[in-house]
Amino acid sequence: MTQAIHAQNISYPNSLKGNVSDTYFGKEIKDPYRWLEDDLSEETKAWVLEQNKVAFGHLEKIPFRQDIVRRLTAMWNYERISAPFKKGKNTYFYKNNGLQNQSVLYKKTKKGEEVFLDPNTFSKDGTTSLAGLNFSKSGKFCAYQISVAGSDWRKVILIDTKTKAILEDTLIDVKFSGISWFKDEGFYYSSYDRPKGSELSEKTDQHKLYYHKLGTKQKDDVLIFGGNDAQKRRYVSGSVSKDMKYLFISAANSTSGNELYFKDLSKKDSPIVAIVANFENDHYILDTRKGKFYIVTNKNAPNKKIVITDAANPNPENWKDFIAETNQVLSPSTGSGFIFAHYMIDAVSAVKQYDYNGKLVREIKLPGVGTASGFGGEDKDKELYFSFTNYVTPGTIYSFNPKTGENKIYQRPKVQF
């Protein structure tokens, strides 16, 4: 039956060949299908429509297609709940009833739970998705990003977490950006200048970091980094330390290797200071404590390590190893006043718990042989959460007591297989 389907002759629509070419280093390179790069043209839309007719016409002839649909639906149709996380006085978690296109964000209440944000209501056709979400320091405000039809150009919408009222501070044309709040006053975000042509094919190579103050217009946002040729970078991001004292800036021209800068937010008009001023390695700030920076780096450590340095002398020559490199790749997280070092050893998770003096507190006993992720949270959290799964265990959420090292099941999915 399958062979008969494959043996059918498929008549594909004609794809027009153009006469476009470029010359690089004296050699002509033909590009006959460049017209398809214009995703907004009527010609491209018509071409996609005809291609879809052929593809779906072929797929609809598969005799066992509905059997596959029924089996996959049965396997996917079970409730999934994420690990809870606290923001301010509220506790949130994501839940999917099994067949929802996007998980719904819930807030715990005295009576149980309530829907806080449902991405499935963003559009009637389901093509608008939740692309990011961040809460302000006290949890009073939430900024979330939406993406339409998978576009990297996003809109940032702000809401009051108590009333769920949408604020007037909606931002547009935000691309490749996180949101990092400074207290409840505003936040840092990144974007490019809006391209004049197609958003899918026009060049964007100068990322800029901005600060948006609540209650102001986007056009009045303050440019922090990336506004001149000396600061021209393809990717720029900003993150505020947990104590709200420092802004850290990562700048890169590719997906490997980045510069690292910081700005003291406790001092008015403080300069941007370089920590690393080259693209030779990857670095990011894990945490800060009492003027000390905890940096994750692969400088002289391909499997990554954590170093500690002083804000007064942050350059690499002053770095000291905090958690040294091992034979396994390091993936750290922080929570409850501890640092958790996650390693994969022969495809099996191993997690170690350290205090901020670098002392090993314990090697965490996991529920079994498998993959664990999580252990992140705020310093004041008295319990943390992690997920665990293996070949015979669907993703299960555990609560973890950082003082005793004990863990227990928080939520186990009920599957039908």
Residue ranges and their predicted role:
Residues Q8-E28:
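Charged, compositionally biased N-terminal leader segments and the immediate start
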Residues M1-N9:
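Bacterial Sec-dependent N-terminal signal peptides
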